Amino acid sequence: MNPLQPIQHSITNSQMSGGQQLEAEGSQAHNSYSHPDRISLSQLSQSAHLALDHLSTQPNTDHQRVASLVRNAVQDGKFQLQSSNDTQVTYKTSVCPPANADTMGAAHLINNELTVQARLNDQLEYDIVSAHLYGPSEAISIDASSPPSANDLASSGLSERTHLGMNRVLLRYAVPPRETEDQCVMVIDKMPPPKHGKMSFFRTTNDLSKLPLGMETGGLSDLKLAGCERISSVEQVKSIRAALGGGPLTVLDLREESHAIVNGLPITLRGPMDWANAGLSQVDGAARESAMITELKRTKSLTLVDANYVKGKKSNPQTTELKNLNVRSEREVVTEAGATYRRVAITDHNRPSPEATDELVDIMRHCLQANESLVVHCNGGRGRTTTAMIMVDMLKNARNHSAETLITRMAKLSYDYNMTDLGSISALKRPFLEDRLKFLQAFHDYARNNPSGLSLNWTQWRAKIALE
């Protein structure tokens, strides 16, 4: 990917030169859905999981084998996108025999090709339509049943409540439509850049003066936790460390979108919803950003657009031309400041995926157990940042305080970022933010039942309660 091509294209595009605002319409986004290059378990619908479970229990050993191969390939991230047509998509991988092929009836599973056909449903999850195993000596095809209705789920004993245990919530993590190259431009996130180590929406559990009198604060001051907007300078990192009392500091970057620092300015390759990298794995997203930075370092000049124009908040693009580029990654800036840099990508306006949640828990628990300072940040310092700060509070204090108490106090500390008020949220964002709130309530249950000494991670615990 050449990051400069969409920059120039978008700046000279007739829509932009005409001064029109870029808008993200839900219907347009669905019609131009960009399916992920690889599909994960978290992207499968409940119906897909039930279909695989059903096939695994059938007397037909071929069906059992294919269901097992499909589940393992999805879990290992081996399926690769082959073709798509609107909501229909095909993924393919090659399969090899297991260590004990006889136990699987897979003596001829060398150089076999496994494909699945899936359909994107209204919840932006994938239902499995069919699966096919092709090899030199056999070909097996199975059709998955259509998604069961609510009545079917209830009659099968797999209703939402019973499937995850009493009072447990069925979560529906969904990946939003990835923005196309034509939608994405290189923007300046903040102009003028912050000075003297300052940053917007900075808050720390070392300073609770923003909280109203009488609010429950038990355990907050023990977290050594901070949150803020994007980081773009060594001075900012040093300022954060000082505010947290000095000592070791981990900077946890929650941004999925490709970003860098150019001539001291924070820049991002993004579209209207900031979904340029939606659906990419952590590895693929990092590789895309690395390629962008490499290309920028070869560039002599760069024309950038004000981020608020791309978001649809301004009618004037307010372009800025930079020359003699000094390009740095956030990792380089954080490392120069003497801090540890960690990255767990979360899609903007969304909650962490199950896989990302496991990574976050590992990092957060390490900092809590080692009594090390942790600062989390996204782009604006609001949604993803507040979500992560609530998760840290829950890991430490879920046994002593309710989910409502912990969500409310961290939202209040985060400049009154009310995560429970969805009344003014756009229709495109609403399902993701509703699911984020359900996730936090479920995460409180996890943190209460899995204090730091226990070995179950988030996905293991969710699998465990699904069987209860």
Curated annotation (Swiss-Prot):
Chief site of localization: secreted
Catalytic class of the enzyme: hydrolase
GO biological process, one term: symbiont-mediated perturbation of host programmed cell death
Protein name per the record: Effector protein hopD2
Induction text: Transcriptionally induced by HrpL.
Region (Disordered): 1-35
Subunit composition and interactions: Interacts with EFR and FLS2 (via the kinase and cytoplasmic domains).
Active-site annotation: 378 (phosphocysteine intermediate)
Organism: Pseudomonas syringae pv. tomato (strain ATCC BAA-871 / DC3000)
EC number: 3.1.3.48
Domain Tyrosine-protein phosphatase as annotated: residue spans: 143-468
Description of activity control: Inhibited by sodium orthovanadate.
GO cellular component: extracellular region
Cellular location(s): Secreted
Keywords for the protein's UniProt record, in alphabetical order: Hydrolase, Hypersensitive response elicitation, Phosphoprotein, Protein phosphatase, Secreted, Virulence
Enzymatic reactions: O-phospho-L-tyrosyl-[protein] + H2O = L-tyrosyl-[protein] + phosphate
Record's comment describing the protein's domains: The N-terminal domain (residues 1-142) retains 70% identity to the N-terminal 142 residues of AvrPphD, and is required for translocation into plant cells via T3SS.
Role this protein plays: Effector showing tyrosine-phosphatase activity required for host defense suppression. Functions inside plant cells causing suppression of HR (hypersensitive response), PR1 gene expression and oxidative burst probably by interfering with a MAPK (mitogen-activated protein kinase) pathway. MAPK cascades are known to activate defense-related transcription factors. Inhibits plant pattern-recognition receptors (PRRs) activation.
